[in-house]
């Protein structure tokens, strides 16, 4: 039987592309997401109260 050579490189090629894309992605800390979400929520509540949509 013939041995398969080079099969390890093909299986790891997808992982290498994933990690390269991950390095190029925008890095956002979880604190920033929570703070922006809280600010947007407060702004929505404030604007709805000002416009008379308060429950």
From Swiss-Prot:
Residues 1-29 are cytoplasmic. The chain crosses the membrane at residues 30-51. GO terms for cellular component: plasma membrane. Its main location: membrane. It is found in: Cell membrane. InterPro entries: Preprot_translocase_SecG (IPR023531), SecG/Sec61-beta/Sbh (IPR016482). GO terms for biological process: protein transport. It is a single-pass membrane protein. The keyword 4Fe-4S does not apply. Keywords: Cell membrane, Membrane, Protein transport, Translocation, Transmembrane, Transmembrane helix, Transport. Component of the protein translocase complex. Heterotrimer consisting of alpha (SecY), beta (SecG) and gamma (SecE) subunits. Can form oligomers of the heterotrimer. Involved in protein export. The function of the beta subunit is unknown, but it may be involved in stabilization of the trimeric complex. NCBIfam families: PRK01253.1. Belongs to the SEC61-beta family. This is Preprotein translocase subunit SecG. It comes from Methanosarcina barkeri (strain Fusaro / DSM 804). The gene is secG.
């Amino acid at each position: 039987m013939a041995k398969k050579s080079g099969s390890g490189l093909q299986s790891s090629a997808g992982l290498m592309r994933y990690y390269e894309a991950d390095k190029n992605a925008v890095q956002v800390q979880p604190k920033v997401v929570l703070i922006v979400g809280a600010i947007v929520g407060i702004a929505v509540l404030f604007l709805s109260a000002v416009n008379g949509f308060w429950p």
